Amino acid sequence: VSITSNRGLCGGFNSNIFKKSTELASSVYNDSDVSFVAIGKKGNDFLQKSFNVESNHIDIFDNLNMESVSLIAESLMEKFVNEDFDKIDIIYNKFKNAATQVVVNEQFLPISDLEEDANNNSDYIFEPSKSEIIEELIPKSLKNQLFKAIRDSWASEHGARMTAMHKATDNATELRDQLKLAYNQARQAAITNEILEIVGGAEALNN
């Protein structure tokens, strides 16, 4: 599951996800029957060039809510249960602060510590039963995990775009100052040349 943005002008926000997605597909999975679920237009456009895109969810950011994310999570869980996928990872930009985003790869399914918990022989009494609790809580937990990843990515996108635009503004201001200085120097040189020509002409007339 590759989470990117629908728009550009956000620095390396999307390209970092492209790089991580390609790296996982080629080095970790050795290009062995890898499929992507693309969340975001930029990721969908990039991944379609080289990989199989199982589905894309471009419009989710138009009205991001738990209900729409739950539908995606349910689809992923269903494909995992039906053994269409044997492992599902989520690749996204984790929000650290407005200026810093960290690309992370989280395992979505299978749940890594489920087997370890199952072998825990602690003497607990569950009401309702352990299986009923797991069947109820695990889907909710996975939906929340995906929702958090998308929200993190969304916040990171805005932070990355704000930082990129701030840098662009600073660069434009610096370029403007350089051009202004060059213009003033050229103007001063032109005025000096004109004065020299006038003085030279006056001296020639006097002679």
Language model feature labels by segment:
Residues V1-N207:
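C-terminal beta-strand-loop-alpha-helix "lid" module of Rossmann-like NAD(P)-dependent dehydrogenases
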